[in-house]
């Protein structure tokens, strides 16, 4: 990719696509994005996914945010994400915990905190 495309994440955050690779063998697009969010927190996964959907004309259920790395106080995040051609391929390759994380659902772990074993 010759010129670096810009992606608007929110009013306070803008990203630059550093790497955009088409992986035809797997059926996905692999993107590295550097997001500048000076004076505000790290953008949420939902905000990132919304921006990527608009920028690449994709569907929400085909985008997976793999990793968000932010250095303390820097206001810059490095984001790795994948855009798949089909939901079937995505579900075969990506770990379930990442799909749950991007969907905003949390997996319930067994056990209880302060429930039956607590003294009263």
Swiss-Prot record:
Gene Ontology terms describing biological process: translation
Signal peptide: none
One matching Pfam family: Ribosomal_S24e
InterPro entries: eRP_eS24_sf (IPR053709), Ribosomal_eS24 (IPR001976), Ribosomal_eS24_CS (IPR018098), Ribosomal_uL23/eL15/eS24_sf (IPR012678)
GO CC terms in record: ribonucleoprotein complex; ribosome
Region span, Disordered: 101-120
Molecular function via GO: structural constituent of ribosome
Domain of life: Archaea
Keyword vocabulary terms for this entry: Ribonucleoprotein, Ribosomal protein
Record family assignment: Belongs to the eukaryotic ribosomal protein eS24 family.
Protein's name in the database: Small ribosomal subunit protein eS24
Species of the source: Saccharolobus islandicus (strain L.S.2.15 / Lassen #1) (Sulfolobus islandicus)
């Amino acid at each position: 990719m010759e010129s670096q495309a810009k992606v608007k994440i929110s009013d306070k955050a803008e990203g630059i696509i550093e790497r955009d690779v088409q992986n035809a063998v797997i059926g996905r697009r692999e993107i590295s994005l550097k997001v500048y969010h000076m004076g505000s927190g790290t953008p949420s996964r939902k905000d990132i996914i919304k921006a990527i959907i608009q920028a690449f004309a994709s569907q929400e259920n085909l985008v997976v945010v793999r990793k968000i790395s932010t250095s303390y106080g820097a206001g810059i995040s490095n984001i790795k994400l994948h855009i798949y051609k089909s939901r079937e391929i995505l579900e075969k390759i990506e770990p379930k915990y990442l799909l749950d994380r991007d969907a905003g659902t949390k997996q319930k772990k067994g056990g209880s905190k302060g429930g039956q074993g607590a003294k009263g």
